[in-house]
Amino acid sequence: MANSSPVYDWFQERLEIQDIADDIGSKYVPPHVNIFYCLGGITLVCFLIQFATGFAMTFYYKPTVAEAYKSVEYLMTDVSFGWLIRSVHRWSASMMVLMLILHVFRVYLTGGFKRPRELTWVTGVTMAVITVSFGVTGYSLPWDQVGYWAVKIVSGVPAAIPVVGDFMVELLRGGESVGQATLTRFYSLHTFVMPWLLAVFMLMHFLMIRKQGISGPL
């Protein structure tokens, strides 16, 4: 590379970063690809916004039944731009779900789930389930009337499953009733377990797309 900087030369000598850049930049893009093939990328951008704004809110949120609502209220009224951070988090959550739905429809209608891309489809559907679960767990965190009763209803749904239903309800709630243990579990799922799960499946999803390329036209 002509007129390269010493910093570039240092990294190039050790990591051969130019080869990596050439490989990324030279990936073939089929001529049939249009704006609707960007829906998956937009979903990723929404997730990154969710991660950044969610991380910012953890500095102020208190996951206890006594202080959760007050901490959210404090974030919205007293923290500089706290209202904006939480609002962006909510808006990007809605946008992420919408883009995900449109992305799934695009892939299905263009046959992107067919052989040899079955595993790519499976990882995508798994991410869709995790994304919906994000919404369910996040909805409860303010611990207001809406959040409380939403958790009570959602966590009671598995009771209809034969044999293991009652066990699953107690596992979700952390006991026989909805309370502090429930909020702690939902907070842990929303801020730690699900982000890591989604990140792992995203990596698998992108690596398979990178390996197999974009599916052809119908």
Curated annotation (Swiss-Prot):
The 4 large subunits of the cytochrome b6-f complex are cytochrome b6, subunit IV (17 kDa polypeptide, PetD), cytochrome f and the Rieske protein, while the 4 small subunits are PetG, PetL, PetM and PetN. The complex functions as a dimer. It comes from the Bacteria. Keywords: Electron transport, Heme, Iron, Membrane, Metal-binding, Photosynthesis, Thylakoid, Transmembrane, Transmembrane helix, Transport. Heme 1 (or BH or b566) is high-potential and absorbs at about 566 nm, and heme 2 (or BL or b562) is low-potential and absorbs at about 562 nm. It comes from Synechococcus sp. (strain CC9605). This is Cytochrome b6. Its cofactor is heme b; heme c. Pfam families: Cytochrome_B. It is found in: Cellular thylakoid membrane. Disulfide bonds: none annotated. Binds 2 heme b groups non-covalently with two histidine residues as axial ligands. Component of the cytochrome b6-f complex, which mediates electron transfer between photosystem II (PSII) and photosystem I (PSI), cyclic electron flow around PSI, and state transitions. GO terms for molecular function: electron transporter, transferring electrons within cytochrome b6/f complex of photosystem II activity; metal ion binding; oxidoreductase activity. GO terms for biological process: photosynthesis; respiratory electron transport chain. Belongs to the cytochrome b family. PetB subfamily. PROSITE patterns: CYTB_NTER (PS51002). It is a multi-pass membrane protein. SUPFAM superfamilies: Transmembrane di-heme cytochromes (SSF81342). Heme b 1 binds at residues 103, 205. Its main location: membrane. Gene3D superfamilies: Cytochrome Bc1 Complex, Chain C. InterPro entries: Cyt_b/b6_N, Cyt_B6_PetB, Cytb/b6-like_sf, Cytochrome_b_N_euk/bac, Di-haem_cyt_TM. Heme c binds at residue 38. Heme b 2 binds at residues 89, 190. The chain crosses the membrane at residues 35-55, 93-113, 119-139, 189-209.
